[in-house]
A protein has these predicted regions:
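A short beta-strand-loop micro-motif that forms or neighbors metal/cofactor-
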Residues: 140-156
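Structural signal for conserved beta-strand scaffold positions within catalytic alpha/beta enzyme cores
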Residues: 56-59, 128, 149
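Short, basic/aromatic beta-hairpin or loop at an interaction surface
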Residues: 115-125
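Gly/Pro-biased beta-strand-loop elements
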Residues: 2-117, 136-143, 159, 165-188
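Short beta-strand-centered segments at strand-helix junctions
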Residues: 123-138
Length: 188
């Protein structure tokens, strides 16, 4: 797959919210080119946005237990879908089989039991992956890996002497004025 990479350090995990993609740059072996693995993701819905910035993977877990916050439980109950205070591993657990805990409290990178939410703003701020994609990343991503989250609806890249632009839908709650920013973006 060809994709224009986000404007971010090419190390560890990089998440582009607008593109709804995760990129993993494993440390290259001496003398070998840098590899990048990329997968589609689901991100935080309006009102539950995924934060931008830099953090690290502080824990890794297989068959995680989900302990939803009171606010998440309340929202589920209001929508006619009550959830328990503790959800054990298994097919009803929305975290799926694997999770990475981030240095930001309450934010995770994890699998899902509802794959239709990948590619959408469907979470309470966490980053969701298809079960097979989180399984692949879980085998590769070590504890302490740097995680950079950006929101770049417009990405640029050079390929064979030509400048390419890839545009994604601007997230509904993105406060930036992208019409004013067009000239600045194109000047770079």
């Amino acid at each position: 797959m060809s994709a224009i990479l986000p404007n971010a350090p090419r190390e560890g995990i990089v998440i582009n919210l607008a593109a709804m993609r995760i990129f993993y740059y494993p440390k290259p072996k001496k003398g070998e080119p840098q590899l990048v693995y990329t997968h589609p993701i689901g991100v935080g819905k309006v009102g539950w946005s995924t934060p931008e910035g830099t953090t690290r993977v502080v824990a890794r877990e297989t068959d995680p237990i989900w302990r939803p916050s009171a606010a998440v439980r309340r929202e589920h109950a209001e929508n006619g879908d009550p959830v328990a205070k503790v959800v054990k591993p298994g097919p009803d657990n929305p975290l799926g089989k694997y999770k990475f805990t981030l240095g930001w409290p309450s934010y995770l990178i994890h699998g899902t039991n509802k794959p239709y939410g990948v590619g959408l703003r469907s979470s309470h701020g966490c980053i969701r992956l298809y079960p097979e994609d989180i399984e692949q990343l879980y085998q590769m991503v070590p504890l302490g890996t740097k995680v950079t989250v950006v929101n770049q609806p417009f990405v640029f890249g050079w390929h064979q002497g030509q400048l390419h632009l890839q545009a994604y839908t601007v997230l509904e709650d993105d406060p930036r004025d992208w019409k004013k920013a067009q000239k600045t973006l194109l000047a770079k």
